Amino acid sequence: EKGVEINLVINGVNLNSGKNILMDIPEKHPGLTHVAFRIDSIIDTMASLDQHNIEISQGPVTFGRDGEASVFIRDPDRNTIELRGRIEDEDKIPGLEFYDPNA
């Protein structure tokens, strides 16, 4: 199914001992942390970011065995944007790591 999926990620309750698993900076606080967009291909997206000299601020990371990976970037106003897509081939995603928010 094609379309747009927008996720507004809010850290409203401190369930992770102050660790916000969805931000690319160490300081954690309640509130809106970032917006997330679903993409078709994490590999193609990473290639496009590189081609356009857009720095990945965190990632690629996977949060579990759901078959998806995320990269985080910053817009010109320094807002965090998550780009999340399926893992087509783990071996073709350089630097893919499992992100443990409690580590």
Predicted ranges, named:
Residues 1-36, 46-74, 87-103:
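Vicinal oxygen chelate
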Residues 83:
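Conserved SAM-binding loop
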